[in-house]
Amino acid sequence: MTENSDKVPIALVGPDDVEFCGPPAYATVTVKPSGPARLLKVGAVVLISGAVLLLFGAIGAFYLWKGSDNHIYNVHYTMSINGKLQDGSMEIDARNNLETFKMGSGAEEAIEVNDFQNGITGIRFAGGEKCYIKAQVKARVPEVGTVTQQSISSELEGKIMPVKHEEEALVWVAVGQPVQDNSFLSARVLELCGDLPIFWLKPTYPKEIQRERREVVRKTVPTTTKRPHSGPRGNPGPARMRNDSRPSVQEDSEPFNPDNPYHQEGESMTFDPRLDHEGICCIECRRSYTHCQKICEPLGGYNPWPYNYQGCRSACRVVMPCSWWVARILGMV
């Protein structure tokens, strides 16, 4: 054998020589993707598709609700107060039994919320330091359908509303102390007042009118007490019949029912006089008008007649004919 031939035993092969014994690089085996990775991809696709469907469903439901909801309606109008044109708006919320009136803008804005469910009216003036409430009759605001919306628009929009301001009659004056417990107020009235102190309003008449009202009461009481004894004496005549049918006598003899302000008598409809007195609607009117009321602060200290209040501001609202309201409440129109 040749001396130069080197034979190395396999047992003597070092670790550096093992790489020569391995398979070539192109002979590596391909590994298949694992199952959890595939499931993650499928889950992500399903999740994104579901989110997109929910988004489109929410958008469709919102537009469907917005188009079919007829419980809230807004109308804007123009009124003339002391020769100055001012914009106003009325919002009817039949679902919550509320009416909201806004008059003026900026520092002259006045907001009135009528809560017919609880029989409370809330009034707030821009820049004021107080919020006012007063009691009112309870009623039910009709739902505002398409026909009613057209009727309100034709009645109010595009016209200058006449103003009825009782300068020498009724004045609302705030009491001296604020309300301590406001739990009886609705959420809408509390939202209107915010953090301002809330004061009750009490009706106040000038001294001359108070004396006239007392004189009328003195003259009316003897007449009503002697009426049962005057029947057999004969026919009282047309003049006596007219006096007996005056609304003032009906107000004294019939209690006011806030749950049924409309009474059916035969084929005609009669209205409770307090609906007109409280400014809910107008019994004798054939068209709507703007009713303004004076909200004043009490004059502290010595109160010389007739200056027992100060700092008066006006809050105005639209008053519709009672026949217009009852037609919609009873579903006649």
From Swiss-Prot:
SMART domains for this protein: BRICHOS (SM01039)
Tell me the segments the record calls region Disordered.
212-269
Q: Which residues form the propeptide?
A: 211-214
Would the keyword Transmembrane turn up in this protein's UniProt record?
yes
Recount the PTM note.
Answer: After cleavage, the post-translationally modified ChM-I is secreted as a glycoprotein.
Q: Which cysteines are joined by disulfide bonds?
A: C131-C193, C281-C285, C282-C322, C292-C316, C296-C312
A GO CC term assigned to this protein in UniProt? extracellular region
Q: Does the keyword Transmembrane helix apply?
A: yes
Tell me the Pfam families matching this sequence. BRICHOS
Residue ranges occupied by any BRICHOS domain in the UniProt entry: 104-201
Give the glycosylated residues.
N243
Keywords noted in UniProt: Chondrogenesis, Cleavage on pair of basic residues, Developmental protein, Differentiation, Disulfide bond, Extracellular matrix, Glycoprotein, Membrane, Secreted, Transmembrane, Transmembrane helix
Name the GO terms of the biological process aspect. Answer: cartilage development; cell differentiation; negative regulation of angiogenesis; negative regulation of endothelial cell proliferation
Q: For this UniProt entry, which segments traverse the membrane?
A: 42-62
Similarity comment: family membership: Belongs to the chondromodulin-1 family.
Function, please? Bifunctional growth regulator that stimulates the growth of cultured chondrocytes in the presence of basic fibroblast growth factor (FGF) but inhibits the growth of cultured vascular endothelial cells. May contribute to the rapid growth of cartilage and vascular invasion prior to the replacement of cartilage by bone during endochondral bone development. Inhibits in vitro tube formation and mobilization of endothelial cells. Plays a role as antiangiogenic factor in cardiac valves to suppress neovascularization.
Instruction: Kindly provide the name given to this protein in its UniProt entry.
Output: Leukocyte cell-derived chemotaxin 1
Quote the gene name from the UniProt entry: CNMD
